[in-house]
Amino acid sequence: MKTKLTTLALIALTSGVFAAPQTFDFKDPKGINNAGFKLDAPLESINGTASGVSGTVSFDPENPGATTGKIVVATASLMVPNSMQRGHMLGAQWLDAAKFPEISFEAKEFKNVKTEGDTTTADVTGTFTLKGISKELTVPVKLTYMKDKLADRMPGQKGDLLVIRAGFSIKRTDFNVNPGQNEDKVSNTIELTLSIAGASAK
C-alpha cells in the first residue's frame, strides 16, 4: 500500500513538472487585437493600425522561456485615416497587399527571460516577414498569463488568456517598401507595436 501511494505521488509530481504547454489562438472574434505602425517623418507623420491578427502561440506557464509561435497580420487590414494614402500603402510600390497578403513574425528563441508572478519579459528572436522578405529580428516582449480569465473577455467561455505586448522598429528600405522615397516626407523607420490577447479554451 505504501509503495502504491508513493508511486501515485511521484506520478502527480511528474505530471506537474512536465505539464504540456498550452496553445493560445490569437484570432480574436471581437476584433480588438491590433498591431500599430508609425512613420514619423519631418513633413508627414503616418499613423495606423491593423486588426486582422491571427496565429497561435505555445506557452507553458511553468517554462515561459520555451514559448514558440507565429503571429500573422493580414496586410489588407492596415488602416490609416486618409483613404487615398491607404490606397497607396496597399499598392504595389508600398506593401503590395494583393501579392503579399500577410505580414508575420515567427518566434524561435527567448533570452533574458524574467518572470514575476504571471508576467514574463524577454527578448525574443524570430523571423519577421514583410512583402516577401524575411529577416531575423530580436524584439522585447511582455507576456501576461491570465488563468481562467477567458470568460472575462468572452462571456460564456472557459479557459485562459495570454496577453502579448511588444514594440520594435524596422527599416522600410530593408523590406523594399517604397524605395527611393524622400525621407523628409516618408520616414525610413517604421515603428511597430503589438497589443493582442490569445485564448486557450477548456
Regions found by a protein language model. Give the residues of each.
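Low-complexity, acidic/polar, glycine-enriched regions of mature
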Residues: 19-202
